[in-house]
Amino acid sequence: MLNTILTGEPSDRPPLLIVHGLFGSARNWGVIARRIGTDRQVISVDMRNHGDSHWTESHDYFGMAEDLAEVLEHHGRADVLGHSMGGKASMVLALTRPDLVRRLIVADIAPVGYGHDQLDNIRKMKQVDLEKIASRAEATEMMGDLEAATAAFFLQSLDLQEKRWKLNLDVLERDMETILGFPEVEGRFDGPALFLSGAKSSYVTPAHHAAVEALFPEAVMEEIAGAGHWLHAEKPREVEAAVRGFIEG
């Protein structure tokens, strides 16, 4: 089963499952998990090939959805919040196992393919000589021209003591086209769904609304003012309020 971080105690309210994005980990949503975990249990997962979860030979959305289903079969039906890659995995979970999902929140992603890729970032991480580095500052220098915030985000997945990335970079690189795409899935999710996007992000636009509504007919679209793709890091209070309002509604 996926590595999980549990925040808060089980209560009469449904648990909230939080699913991070590409190159992330369960800890990325820690601030929001702790705040929402005051009155319900929050289950944050490390996705396959990330963090302290198992490595696999494939990184596709049906496999990721099966991983999430295994977690919820253990913890019970839940509200599910997924960001970016985790949002796509959460959508596939809701479409294939609607019995496990009470309410769905998708953060800044749509059920469509995207043209950009993250291969250059993988190459930068692979430039780090793991045998030689003694500090994160040295790793940052080896990665070359990266924004400070991006480098800091990647370094959360660097285990200096074990001299390894907690990311299966080879598989993520090989399956990047699959990660950027969205699989053909039969059926639809008729439960409540909130598609939360950053107003400054280009990941979800009005052109994507038809694709969302075809699979999630009850979807509500909401923007977080002033936020980009990393809306939970940029506007945590606003994201928390939107999530809380939706799951308590």
Model regions: which residues?
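Flexible "cap/lid" loop of the alpha/beta hydrolase fold
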Residues: 91-96, 100-134
